[in-house]
Amino acid sequence: MSDRLTLLRPDDWHIHLRDGAVLPHTVGDVARTFARAIIMPNLVPPVRNAAEAGAYRERILAARPAGSRFEPLMVLYLTDRTSPEDVRAAKASGIVYAAKLYPAGATTNSDSGVTSIDNIFPAIEALAEVGMPLLVHGEVTRSEIDVFDREKRFIDEHMRRVVERFPTLKVVFEHITTSDAAQFVTEAPANVGATITAQHLLYNRNHMLVGGIRPHFYCLPILKRNTHQVALLDAATSGNPKFFLGTDSAPHARHAKEAACGCAGCYTAYAAIEMYAEAFEQRNALDKLEGFASLHGPAFYGLPANTDTITLVREEWTAPDSLPFGEQTVVPLRAGEKLRWRLLEENA
């Protein structure tokens, strides 16, 4: 078994960078490993049009480390009021690569999200016409639906209908967490793909809840039972190009996580590819990591793969207990724990 693993430089097809004083920290972490990233638009206020996307992009570019060529790929936040003209203008801007469907109330800063998918059918039709992917946070939000069932219910109530109604639309089922979602994507047409996070490959709800509540494992969609974790590992390591890397790295200040009503989100950008390598190694599937991390995503988006490389070495190191986050700190996933792979920084 080799102690070195060289991959074409990967991209992150789903990340939260936040805004303001924290950007130098979050952008620095993602740029360390990834060439490009799909930037989530759930700011306050959200990124609703091409002009707002352009302004946010400039703030991200200004926060890049010296010499970095990291490229943010911007995303439009869909609301009930998003028009086909908004979609066409976003496409014409050349900097917006997708549009994001957040059901209202599904996750952090989603209050401006879509209250009924039917409300945005004209915008979705425009997405299909211009060839821009629809990114979907696939959970229903009705209070009577159990939090562990919300992804499956979304598939049954909405996802199948959208895919059937818009057969040419590229759809990314983001951060899938269930065997139901993995099966749906596998059986769907080629224009339907999915991202999978490192935490959903490495952990299940027992890790979050047994022996005490661990708030830094709490994210949305929530970790599920181990049978779903196994199904996600099967999908990610299968070599199926429908599945690709999306960290959903989502930082919150320590006090916002370690609280009586803590925020959802795991911060993984600082060591994401190292964590994915651990998950793939558990399946003896390190040979499949480059496809998942570096090839499948660009192919789905119709973009070229990166040509430079990164190298991981099998070397234990201890994750930091906390990281700077503006004037505060963020506790990363795996804080204080050993990681088995390390990125050679000279290749970053």
Swiss-Prot record:
Gene Ontology CC terms: cytosol
Positions carrying N6-carboxylysine: K100
InterPro entries (UniProt xref): Amidohydro-rel, DHOdimr, Dihydroorotase_CS, Metal_Hydrolase
Active site: D248
Enzyme Commission (EC) number: 3.5.2.3
Cofactor names: Zn(2+)
Ligand binding (substrate): H16, L17, R18, N42, H137, L220, H252, A264
Catalytic activity: (S)-dihydroorotate + H2O = N-carbamoyl-L-aspartate + H(+)
Residues that hold Zn(2+) 2 according to the record: K100, H137, H175
Pathway membership: Pyrimidine metabolism; UMP biosynthesis via de novo pathway; (S)-dihydroorotate from bicarbonate: step 3/3
CDD domains reported for this sequence: DHOase
A single MF term (Gene Ontology): zinc ion binding
HAMAP family (alphabetical): PyrC_classII
Protein name (Swiss-Prot/TrEMBL): Dihydroorotase
Underlying gene: pyrC
